[in-house]
Protein backbone atom coordinates (compact mmCIF):
# COMPACT_ATOMS: atom_id res chain seq x y z
CA UNK A 1 0.00 0.00 0.00
CA UNK A 2 2.96 2.26 0.24
CA UNK A 3 4.24 4.50 -2.56
CA UNK A 4 7.48 3.66 -4.26
CA UNK A 5 9.03 6.73 -5.92
CA UNK A 6 10.58 5.86 -9.27
CA UNK A 7 12.07 7.57 -12.30
CA UNK A 8 9.63 6.83 -15.12
CA UNK A 9 9.87 7.35 -18.86
CA UNK A 10 7.18 9.45 -20.47
CA UNK A 11 6.05 8.51 -23.98
CA UNK A 12 5.10 11.59 -25.98
CA UNK A 13 4.05 11.30 -29.60
CA UNK A 14 6.62 9.12 -31.32
CA UNK A 15 9.47 9.91 -28.92
CA UNK A 16 10.45 9.07 -25.36
CA UNK A 17 11.28 11.76 -22.78
CA UNK A 18 12.57 11.13 -19.24
CA UNK A 19 10.48 12.46 -16.40
CA UNK A 20 9.86 11.84 -12.78
CA UNK A 21 6.51 10.39 -11.72
CA UNK A 22 5.03 8.81 -8.71
CA UNK A 23 4.45 5.08 -8.75
CA UNK A 24 1.54 4.82 -6.39
CA UNK A 25 -0.40 1.91 -5.00
CA UNK A 26 -2.63 1.41 -2.02
CA UNK A 27 -1.68 -2.02 -0.70
CA UNK A 28 -0.49 -3.97 1.15
CA UNK A 29 -2.42 -7.30 1.12
CA UNK A 30 -5.99 -15.52 -12.22
CA UNK A 31 -9.34 -22.15 -19.96
CA UNK A 32 -12.40 -22.53 -23.40
CA UNK A 33 -15.62 -20.56 -22.79
CA UNK A 34 -18.66 -21.71 -20.91
CA UNK A 35 -21.11 -24.19 -22.31
CA UNK A 36 -24.62 -23.00 -22.97
CA UNK A 37 -26.40 -20.37 -25.07
CA UNK A 38 -24.37 -17.39 -26.32
CA UNK A 39 -23.88 -14.64 -23.77
CA UNK A 40 -24.97 -12.02 -26.24
CA UNK A 41 -28.59 -13.13 -25.90
CA UNK A 42 -30.60 -10.60 -23.88
CA UNK A 43 -33.59 -11.84 -21.94
CA UNK A 44 -36.81 -9.93 -21.31
CA UNK A 45 -37.25 -8.49 -17.85
CA UNK A 46 -40.48 -7.49 -16.19
CA UNK A 47 -38.95 -4.82 -14.00
CA UNK A 48 -35.59 -3.10 -14.02
CA UNK A 49 -35.08 -3.31 -10.30
CA UNK A 50 -36.69 -5.09 -7.41
CA UNK A 51 -38.24 -2.86 -4.73
CA UNK A 52 -36.11 -2.06 -1.71
CA UNK A 53 -37.13 -2.47 1.90
CA UNK A 54 -38.12 0.73 3.72
CA UNK A 55 -35.07 2.49 5.12
CA UNK A 56 -32.68 0.80 2.71
CA UNK A 57 -33.20 3.30 -0.08
CA UNK A 58 -33.74 7.02 0.02
CA UNK A 59 -31.87 10.24 0.59
CA UNK A 60 -28.79 10.38 2.79
CA UNK A 61 -27.92 14.04 2.31
CA UNK A 62 -25.58 14.23 5.30
CA UNK A 63 -23.43 11.40 3.90
CA UNK A 64 -23.17 12.52 0.27
CA UNK A 65 -19.69 13.73 -0.68
CA UNK A 66 -18.17 12.58 2.63
CA UNK A 67 -15.11 10.96 0.99
CA UNK A 68 -11.88 12.64 -0.06
CA UNK A 69 -8.52 11.47 -1.32
CA UNK A 70 -5.99 11.62 -4.13
CA UNK A 71 -5.87 9.59 -7.31
CA UNK A 72 -4.05 6.34 -6.59
CA UNK A 73 -3.77 7.02 -2.87
CA UNK A 74 -7.18 5.88 -1.63
CA UNK A 75 -10.42 7.39 -0.38
CA UNK A 76 -10.81 8.45 3.23
CA UNK A 77 -13.66 9.46 5.52
CA UNK A 78 -13.43 11.69 8.58
CA UNK A 79 -13.92 9.83 11.87
CA UNK A 80 -13.62 10.73 15.55
CA UNK A 81 -12.11 8.43 18.15
CA UNK A 82 -12.06 8.66 21.95
CA UNK A 83 -13.29 11.07 24.62
CA UNK A 84 -12.83 13.93 24.02
CA UNK A 85 -13.08 13.13 20.28
CA UNK A 86 -9.89 13.05 18.24
CA UNK A 87 -10.49 13.67 14.52
CA UNK A 88 -8.69 11.46 12.00
CA UNK A 89 -8.98 10.75 8.28
CA UNK A 90 -9.45 7.01 7.74
CA UNK A 91 -8.94 5.08 4.48
CA UNK A 92 -12.06 3.17 3.38
CA UNK A 93 -10.99 -0.40 2.59
CA UNK A 94 -13.39 -3.18 1.61
CA UNK A 95 -10.44 -5.58 1.28
CA UNK A 96 -9.58 -5.91 4.97
CA UNK A 97 -11.39 -6.11 8.32
CA UNK A 98 -9.34 -4.24 10.92
CA UNK A 99 -9.96 -0.70 12.09
CA UNK A 100 -6.41 0.53 12.62
CA UNK A 101 -5.05 4.02 13.24
CA UNK A 102 -1.63 5.56 13.59
CA UNK A 103 -0.88 5.86 17.31
CA UNK A 104 2.71 7.05 17.30
CA UNK A 105 4.65 9.81 15.54
CA UNK A 106 5.48 9.06 11.89
CA UNK A 107 7.11 11.27 9.22
CA UNK A 108 4.05 10.92 6.94
CA UNK A 109 1.44 11.66 9.64
CA UNK A 110 0.35 15.17 10.60
CA UNK A 111 -1.64 13.79 13.54
CA UNK A 112 -2.20 10.47 15.26
CA UNK A 113 -4.42 8.79 17.84
CA UNK A 114 -3.26 9.50 21.40
CA UNK A 115 -4.76 6.81 23.59
CA UNK A 116 -3.55 8.39 26.81
CA UNK A 117 -5.75 11.42 26.14
CA UNK A 118 -8.94 9.36 25.83
CA UNK A 119 -10.86 8.64 29.01
CA UNK A 120 -12.86 5.90 27.27
CA UNK A 121 -9.95 3.88 25.86
CA UNK A 122 -9.71 0.27 27.07
CA UNK A 123 -6.55 -1.74 26.51
CA UNK A 124 -7.16 -5.35 25.42
CA UNK A 125 -3.54 -6.28 26.22
CA UNK A 126 -3.13 -8.03 22.89
CA UNK A 127 -0.83 -7.23 19.98
CA UNK A 128 -1.59 -7.47 16.27
CA UNK A 129 0.66 -7.76 13.21
CA UNK A 130 -0.55 -7.27 9.63
CA UNK A 131 1.79 -7.89 6.65
CA UNK A 132 1.00 -6.86 3.08
CA UNK A 133 2.63 -7.66 -0.25
CA UNK A 134 4.63 -4.46 0.18
CA UNK A 135 4.68 -3.20 3.72
CA UNK A 136 3.36 -4.06 7.14
CA UNK A 137 2.16 -2.61 10.41
CA UNK A 138 1.94 -3.78 13.99
CA UNK A 139 0.20 -2.41 17.01
CA UNK A 140 -1.81 -2.93 20.17
CA UNK A 141 -5.50 -3.78 20.38
CA UNK A 142 -8.01 -1.83 22.41
CA UNK A 143 -11.53 -0.42 22.22
CA UNK A 144 -12.83 3.14 22.23
CA UNK A 145 -15.82 5.24 21.24
CA UNK A 146 -16.01 5.95 17.50
CA UNK A 147 -18.29 8.08 15.34
CA UNK A 148 -18.45 9.35 11.75
CA UNK A 149 -19.34 13.08 11.65
CA UNK A 150 -20.68 12.90 8.09
CA UNK A 151 -22.38 9.57 8.68
CA UNK A 152 -25.13 8.19 10.88
CA UNK A 153 -25.67 10.15 14.08
CA UNK A 154 -24.45 7.37 16.38
CA UNK A 155 -21.45 6.51 18.52
CA UNK A 156 -20.24 2.93 18.95
CA UNK A 157 -17.61 1.17 20.98
CA UNK A 158 -15.34 -0.52 18.47
CA UNK A 159 -12.13 -2.52 18.35
CA UNK A 160 -9.15 -0.39 17.39
CA UNK A 161 -5.62 -1.41 16.48
CA UNK A 162 -3.27 1.34 17.61
CA UNK A 163 -0.42 1.23 15.07
CA UNK A 164 2.87 1.71 16.87
CA UNK A 165 5.25 0.54 14.13
CA UNK A 166 4.86 0.37 10.35
CA UNK A 167 6.87 -0.07 7.18
CA UNK A 168 5.72 1.16 3.76
CA UNK A 169 2.13 1.49 4.96
CA UNK A 170 1.39 5.21 5.33
CA UNK A 171 1.65 7.28 2.14
CA UNK A 172 3.39 10.63 2.10
CA UNK A 173 0.87 13.36 1.29
CA UNK A 174 -2.15 11.04 1.24
CA UNK A 175 -3.77 12.87 4.19
CA UNK A 176 -5.11 9.72 5.91
CA UNK A 177 -3.97 8.40 9.29
CA UNK A 178 -5.65 5.00 9.52
CA UNK A 179 -7.61 2.31 7.74
CA UNK A 180 -11.24 1.19 8.11
CA UNK A 181 -11.54 -2.46 7.11
CA UNK A 182 -15.14 -3.10 6.03
CA UNK A 183 -14.88 -6.80 5.15
CA UNK A 184 -15.87 -9.78 7.31
CA UNK A 185 -14.48 -11.13 10.59
CA UNK A 186 -12.94 -14.20 8.92
CA UNK A 187 -9.99 -12.15 7.68
CA UNK A 188 -9.61 -9.94 10.77
CA UNK A 189 -6.24 -9.99 12.53
CA UNK A 190 -5.08 -11.55 14.78
CA UNK A 191 -8.07 -13.90 14.34
CA UNK A 192 -11.78 -13.97 13.52
CA UNK A 193 -12.79 -13.41 17.14
CA UNK A 194 -12.04 -9.69 16.68
CA UNK A 195 -15.31 -8.02 15.72
CA UNK A 196 -14.92 -5.62 12.75
CA UNK A 197 -16.17 -2.04 12.96
CA UNK A 198 -19.22 -2.47 10.72
CA UNK A 199 -20.39 -5.52 12.68
CA UNK A 200 -20.17 -3.48 15.89
CA UNK A 201 -22.04 -0.60 14.25
CA UNK A 202 -24.94 -2.80 13.12
CA UNK A 203 -25.12 -4.72 16.40
CA UNK A 204 -25.07 -1.67 18.69
CA UNK A 205 -27.28 0.72 16.69
CA UNK A 206 -29.55 -1.51 14.58
CA UNK A 207 -28.56 0.41 11.45
CA UNK A 208 -29.41 -1.77 8.40
CA UNK A 209 -26.57 -4.13 7.48
CA UNK A 210 -25.74 -2.42 4.20
CA UNK A 211 -23.45 0.31 2.91
CA UNK A 212 -22.71 1.71 -0.54
CA UNK A 213 -19.80 3.51 -2.18
CA UNK A 214 -19.58 6.07 -4.95
CA UNK A 215 -15.95 6.79 -5.83
CA UNK A 216 -15.53 9.77 -8.17
CA UNK A 217 -11.76 9.85 -8.60
CA UNK A 218 -11.45 10.15 -12.35
CA UNK A 219 -13.91 13.03 -12.41
CA UNK A 220 -11.61 15.48 -10.68
CA UNK A 221 -9.06 17.50 -12.69
CA UNK A 222 -5.35 16.94 -12.15
CA UNK A 223 -2.28 19.09 -12.86
CA UNK A 224 -3.83 21.96 -10.90
CA UNK A 225 -3.63 22.99 -7.27
CA UNK A 226 -3.56 20.31 -4.60
CA UNK A 227 -7.13 21.11 -3.61
CA UNK A 228 -8.43 20.71 -7.14
CA UNK A 229 -6.41 17.55 -7.63
CA UNK A 230 -8.34 15.86 -4.83
CA UNK A 231 -10.80 13.08 -5.52
CA UNK A 232 -14.13 12.68 -3.80
CA UNK A 233 -17.06 10.39 -3.34
CA UNK A 234 -19.70 9.15 -0.94
CA UNK A 235 -20.01 6.35 1.59
CA UNK A 236 -23.66 5.75 2.44
CA UNK A 237 -24.06 3.77 5.66
CA UNK A 238 -27.32 1.92 6.18
CA UNK A 239 -28.85 2.17 2.73
CA UNK A 240 -28.84 3.28 -0.90
CA UNK A 241 -29.02 6.86 -2.19
CA UNK A 242 -30.77 6.85 -5.57
CA UNK A 243 -29.30 10.24 -6.50
CA UNK A 244 -25.83 8.71 -6.80
CA UNK A 245 -26.53 6.41 -9.77
CA UNK A 246 -28.42 6.18 -13.03
CA UNK A 247 -30.28 3.22 -14.52
CA UNK A 248 -30.78 -0.02 -12.63
CA UNK A 249 -28.91 -1.79 -9.86
CA UNK A 250 -27.77 -5.30 -10.76
CA UNK A 251 -26.77 -7.72 -8.02
CA UNK A 252 -24.24 -10.52 -7.86
CA UNK A 253 -24.13 -12.96 -4.90
CA UNK A 254 -21.37 -12.74 -2.32
CA UNK A 255 -19.82 -16.18 -2.73
CA UNK A 256 -18.18 -16.32 0.67
CA UNK A 257 -18.21 -13.90 3.58
CA UNK A 258 -14.54 -13.15 4.12
CA UNK A 259 -13.46 -10.71 1.43
CA UNK A 260 -16.31 -9.47 -0.74
CA UNK A 261 -15.86 -12.42 -3.08
CA UNK A 262 -17.83 -12.61 -6.34
CA UNK A 263 -17.76 -14.83 -9.44
CA UNK A 264 -16.71 -13.53 -12.87
CA UNK A 265 -18.08 -15.72 -15.67
CA UNK A 266 -16.70 -14.02 -18.77
CA UNK A 267 -14.27 -11.27 -19.83
CA UNK A 268 -14.43 -9.31 -23.09
CA UNK A 269 -12.18 -6.69 -24.67
CA UNK A 270 -14.18 -4.48 -27.05
CA UNK A 271 -16.82 -7.20 -27.23
CA UNK A 272 -14.33 -9.97 -28.04
CA UNK A 273 -14.43 -12.89 -25.60
CA UNK A 274 -11.06 -13.90 -24.13
CA UNK A 275 -12.36 -17.49 -24.43
CA UNK A 276 -10.74 -18.80 -21.29
CA UNK A 277 -12.04 -21.35 -18.81
CA UNK A 278 -13.99 -19.14 -16.42
CA UNK A 279 -12.17 -20.68 -13.45
CA UNK A 280 -9.09 -18.79 -14.61
CA UNK A 281 -10.87 -15.48 -13.99
CA UNK A 282 -11.48 -16.45 -10.35
CA UNK A 283 -8.18 -18.15 -9.54
CA UNK A 284 -7.91 -18.21 -6.59
CA UNK A 285 -10.69 -15.67 -5.87
CA UNK A 286 -12.31 -12.51 -7.25
CA UNK A 287 -12.96 -9.67 -4.83
CA UNK A 288 -14.25 -6.08 -4.76
CA UNK A 289 -11.64 -4.01 -2.94
CA UNK A 290 -11.72 -0.23 -2.56
CA UNK A 291 -8.32 -0.35 -0.83
CA UNK A 292 -6.50 -1.49 -3.99
CA UNK A 293 -5.89 0.98 -6.80
CA UNK A 294 -5.81 -1.23 -9.92
CA UNK A 295 -7.82 -3.87 -11.68
CA UNK A 296 -5.59 -6.83 -10.85
CA UNK A 297 -5.85 -10.04 -12.88
CA UNK A 298 -4.36 -13.53 -12.55
CA UNK A 299 -1.26 -14.04 -14.73
CA UNK A 300 -2.92 -15.92 -17.62
CA UNK A 301 -5.87 -13.55 -17.73
CA UNK A 302 -3.64 -10.47 -17.51
CA UNK A 303 -1.49 -11.66 -20.42
CA UNK A 304 -4.54 -12.43 -22.57
CA UNK A 305 -6.20 -9.11 -21.71
CA UNK A 306 -3.08 -7.04 -22.44
CA UNK A 307 -2.61 -8.85 -25.76
CA UNK A 308 -6.18 -7.94 -26.75
CA UNK A 309 -5.88 -4.33 -25.54
CA UNK A 310 -2.60 -3.94 -27.46
CA UNK A 311 -4.24 -5.26 -30.63
CA UNK A 312 -7.23 -2.94 -30.25
CA UNK A 313 -5.03 0.13 -29.68
CA UNK A 314 -2.41 -0.76 -32.32
CA UNK A 315 -2.73 2.58 -34.13
CA UNK A 316 -0.23 3.90 -31.59
CA UNK A 317 2.80 2.13 -30.18
CA UNK A 318 3.55 2.10 -26.47
CA UNK A 319 6.68 0.95 -24.64
CA UNK A 320 6.52 -2.45 -22.94
CA UNK A 321 7.06 -0.74 -19.60
CA UNK A 322 3.73 1.04 -19.96
CA UNK A 323 1.81 -2.26 -20.00
CA UNK A 324 3.72 -3.34 -16.89
CA UNK A 325 2.81 -0.16 -15.02
CA UNK A 326 6.44 1.01 -14.98
CA UNK A 327 6.21 3.86 -17.50
CA UNK A 328 3.75 6.63 -18.23
CA UNK A 329 2.31 7.75 -21.54
CA UNK A 330 1.56 11.41 -22.19
CA UNK A 331 -0.33 13.51 -24.67
CA UNK A 332 -0.65 17.25 -24.99
CA UNK A 333 -3.28 18.46 -22.54
CA UNK A 334 -6.78 17.78 -23.80
CA UNK A 335 -5.74 15.54 -26.72
CA UNK A 336 -5.83 12.07 -25.14
CA UNK A 337 -7.08 9.68 -27.89
CA UNK A 338 -9.58 7.77 -25.75
CA UNK A 339 -11.21 6.30 -28.84
CA UNK A 340 -8.22 4.07 -29.69
CA UNK A 341 -8.49 2.22 -26.39
CA UNK A 342 -11.04 -0.60 -25.98
CA UNK A 343 -13.64 -1.07 -23.28
CA UNK A 344 -13.29 -3.98 -20.85
CA UNK A 345 -16.41 -5.96 -19.95
CA UNK A 346 -16.69 -8.19 -16.91
CA UNK A 347 -19.67 -10.54 -16.71
CA UNK A 348 -20.76 -11.30 -13.15
CA UNK A 349 -23.00 -14.07 -11.90
CA UNK A 350 -26.57 -12.85 -11.47
CA UNK A 351 -29.01 -13.66 -8.70
CA UNK A 352 -31.28 -15.65 -11.01
CA UNK A 353 -30.21 -19.14 -12.11
CA UNK A 354 -28.33 -19.15 -15.44
CA UNK A 355 -28.38 -15.36 -15.73
CA UNK A 356 -25.46 -12.95 -15.64
CA UNK A 357 -24.95 -9.22 -16.18
CA UNK A 358 -21.99 -7.23 -17.40
CA UNK A 359 -20.22 -4.10 -16.28
CA UNK A 360 -18.42 -2.14 -19.00
CA UNK A 361 -15.25 -0.31 -18.00
CA UNK A 362 -13.98 2.67 -19.99
CA UNK A 363 -10.33 3.56 -20.72
CA UNK A 364 -10.97 6.68 -18.62
CA UNK A 365 -11.03 4.25 -15.70
CA UNK A 366 -8.16 1.89 -16.46
CA UNK A 367 -5.82 4.66 -17.64
CA UNK A 368 -5.17 6.42 -14.36
CA UNK A 369 -4.15 10.11 -14.55
CA UNK A 370 -0.89 10.84 -12.75
CA UNK A 371 0.02 14.22 -11.33
CA UNK A 372 3.37 15.64 -10.22
CA UNK A 373 5.06 14.90 -13.54
CA UNK A 374 7.78 17.04 -15.09
CA UNK A 375 5.50 19.18 -17.23
CA UNK A 376 2.00 20.45 -16.65
CA UNK A 377 1.50 20.87 -20.40
CA UNK A 378 0.77 17.17 -20.83
CA UNK A 379 -1.86 14.73 -19.61
CA UNK A 380 -0.01 11.64 -18.38
CA UNK A 381 -1.43 8.24 -17.50
CA UNK A 382 -0.48 4.98 -15.91
CA UNK A 383 -1.91 1.64 -17.06
CA UNK A 384 -4.02 0.60 -14.08
CA UNK A 385 -4.41 -3.07 -14.98
CA UNK A 386 -1.78 -5.26 -13.36
CA UNK A 387 -0.85 -8.85 -12.70
CA UNK A 388 -1.90 -10.59 -9.49
CA UNK A 389 -0.80 -13.74 -7.70
CA UNK A 390 -3.84 -13.72 -5.39
CA UNK A 391 -6.76 -13.65 -7.82
CA UNK A 392 -8.80 -10.91 -9.48
CA UNK A 393 -9.10 -7.65 -7.57
CA UNK A 394 -11.67 -5.12 -8.73
CA UNK A 395 -9.97 -2.08 -7.26
CA UNK A 396 -10.77 1.61 -7.06
CA UNK A 397 -10.21 2.33 -10.77
CA UNK A 398 -13.05 -0.11 -11.54
CA UNK A 399 -15.33 1.10 -8.76
CA UNK A 400 -14.93 4.70 -9.96
CA UNK A 401 -17.30 3.97 -12.83
CA UNK A 402 -20.05 2.54 -10.67
CA UNK A 403 -22.19 2.96 -7.59
CA UNK A 404 -21.43 -0.20 -5.61
CA UNK A 405 -23.83 -1.52 -2.97
CA UNK A 406 -22.50 -3.90 -0.32
CA UNK A 407 -25.76 -5.51 0.77
CA UNK A 408 -24.45 -7.68 3.58
CA UNK A 409 -27.93 -8.51 4.87
CA UNK A 410 -28.87 -10.19 1.59
CA UNK A 411 -25.34 -11.43 0.88
CA UNK A 412 -24.99 -9.63 -2.45
CA UNK A 413 -23.19 -6.75 -4.18
CA UNK A 414 -24.99 -4.34 -6.48
CA UNK A 415 -23.62 -2.35 -9.42
CA UNK A 416 -25.16 0.64 -11.20
CA UNK A 417 -23.64 3.36 -13.38
CA UNK A 418 -22.27 6.11 -11.16
CA UNK A 419 -23.72 9.59 -11.55
CA UNK A 420 -20.17 10.99 -11.35
CA UNK A 421 -18.28 8.67 -13.71
CA UNK A 422 -16.09 10.17 -16.44
CA UNK A 423 -16.90 9.44 -20.08
CA UNK A 424 -16.69 11.00 -23.52
CA UNK A 425 -19.36 11.76 -26.11
CA UNK A 426 -19.05 8.32 -27.69
CA UNK A 427 -19.04 5.83 -24.80
CA UNK A 428 -20.24 5.60 -21.22
CA UNK A 429 -19.76 3.03 -18.49
CA UNK A 430 -22.63 0.55 -18.47
CA UNK A 431 -24.30 -2.13 -16.37
CA UNK A 432 -26.45 -4.35 -18.59
CA UNK A 433 -28.29 -7.65 -18.51
CA UNK A 434 -29.55 -10.22 -18.13
CA UNK A 435 -27.55 -12.63 -20.31
CA UNK A 436 -27.91 -16.39 -20.54
CA UNK A 437 -24.99 -18.14 -18.86
CA UNK A 438 -24.99 -21.80 -17.86
CA UNK A 439 -23.06 -23.58 -15.10
CA UNK A 440 -21.86 -20.37 -13.46
CA UNK A 441 -21.21 -22.09 -10.13
CA UNK A 442 -18.43 -24.05 -11.86
CA UNK A 443 -16.55 -20.79 -12.42
CA UNK A 444 -15.76 -20.37 -8.72
CA UNK A 445 -12.38 -21.65 -7.62
CA UNK A 446 -12.47 -24.06 -4.70
CA UNK A 447 -9.36 -24.06 -2.57
CA UNK A 448 -8.45 -27.71 -1.94
CA UNK A 449 -9.30 -28.63 1.64
CA UNK A 450 -8.58 -31.91 3.37
CA UNK A 451 -10.93 -33.19 6.05
CA UNK A 452 -9.46 -32.88 9.55
CA UNK A 453 -10.09 -36.54 10.39
CA UNK A 454 -8.26 -37.55 7.22
CA UNK A 455 -5.31 -35.40 8.23
CA UNK A 456 -5.21 -37.03 11.67
CA UNK A 457 -5.29 -40.52 10.14
CA UNK A 458 -2.42 -39.61 7.82
CA UNK A 459 -0.47 -38.20 10.76
CA UNK A 460 -0.90 -41.40 12.81
CA UNK A 461 0.13 -43.59 9.86
CA UNK A 462 3.22 -41.47 9.24
CA UNK A 463 4.12 -41.61 12.93
CA UNK A 464 3.80 -45.43 12.94
CA UNK A 465 5.99 -45.72 9.84
CA UNK A 466 8.59 -43.46 11.40
CA UNK A 467 8.55 -45.55 14.59
CA UNK A 468 9.08 -48.79 12.63
CA UNK A 469 12.08 -47.29 10.87
CA UNK A 470 13.48 -45.56 13.93
CA UNK A 471 13.44 -48.59 16.27
CA UNK A 472 16.02 -50.71 14.38
CA UNK A 473 17.98 -47.56 13.65
CA UNK A 474 18.16 -46.74 17.36
CA UNK A 475 19.30 -50.30 18.14
CA UNK A 476 22.00 -50.06 15.49
CA UNK A 477 23.19 -46.72 16.85
CA UNK A 478 23.34 -48.07 20.41
CA UNK A 479 25.30 -51.12 19.28
CA UNK A 480 27.67 -48.93 17.29
CA UNK A 481 28.31 -46.63 20.25
CA UNK A 482 29.08 -49.57 22.54
CA UNK A 483 31.60 -50.97 20.08
CA UNK A 484 33.10 -47.53 19.61
CA UNK A 485 33.58 -47.11 23.35
CA UNK A 486 35.44 -50.42 23.54
CA UNK A 487 37.65 -49.47 20.60
CA UNK A 488 38.23 -46.07 22.13
CA UNK A 489 39.66 -47.64 25.32
CA UNK A 490 42.11 -49.75 23.29
CA UNK A 491 43.03 -46.76 21.12
CA UNK A 492 43.83 -44.64 24.20
CA UNK A 493 46.11 -47.37 25.51
CA UNK A 494 47.92 -47.65 22.18
CA UNK A 495 48.38 -43.86 22.08
CA UNK A 496 49.90 -43.95 25.55
CA UNK A 497 52.39 -46.52 24.39
CA UNK A 498 53.31 -44.41 21.43
CA UNK A 499 53.92 -41.41 23.64
CA UNK A 500 56.17 -43.41 25.90
CA UNK A 501 58.37 -44.34 22.99
UniProtKB/Swiss-Prot annotation:
As recorded in UniProt, coiled-coil segments are none
| Gene Ontology annotations for the cellular component aspect, listed alphabetically | axon; cell surface; cytoplasmic vesicle; cytoplasmic vesicle membrane; dendrite; early endosome; endoplasmic reticulum; endosome
The catalytic site is made up of 93, 289
What PTM annotation applies here? Palmitoylation mediates lipid raft localization. Acetylated in the endoplasmic reticulum at Lys-126, Lys-275, Lys-279, Lys-285, Lys-299, Lys-300 and Lys-307. Acetylation by NAT8 and NAT8B is transient and deacetylation probably occurs in the Golgi. Acetylation regulates the maturation, the transport to the plasma membrane, the stability and the expression of the protein.
User: Where is the segment annotated Interaction with RTN3?
Assistant: 479-501
Stored Pfam families: Asp (PF00026)
Q: Which GO terms describe its biological process?
A: amyloid precursor protein catabolic process; amyloid-beta formation; amyloid-beta metabolic process; cellular response to amyloid-beta; cellular response to copper ion; cellular response to manganese ion; detection of mechanical stimulus involved in sensory perception of pain; membrane protein ectodomain proteolysis
Sugar-modified residues = 153, 172, 223, 354
Give start-end of the signal peptide: 1-21
Q: Per its record, what are the GO molecular function terms?
A: amyloid-beta binding; aspartic-type endopeptidase activity; endopeptidase activity; enzyme binding; peptidase activity; protein serine/threonine kinase binding
- Topological domains (Extracellular): residue ranges? 22-457
Which chemical reaction does it catalyze? Answer: Broad endopeptidase specificity. Cleaves Glu-Val-Asn-Leu-|-Asp-Ala-Glu-Phe in the Swedish variant of Alzheimer's amyloid precursor protein
Q: Mind telling me which SUPFAM superfamilies this protein's record contains?
A: Acid proteases
Q: Which cysteines are joined by disulfide bonds?
A: 216-420, 278-443, 330-380
Q: Which family does it belong to?
A: Belongs to the peptidase A1 family.
Protein name listed in UniProt: Beta-secretase 1
Q: Which gene encodes it?
A: Bace1
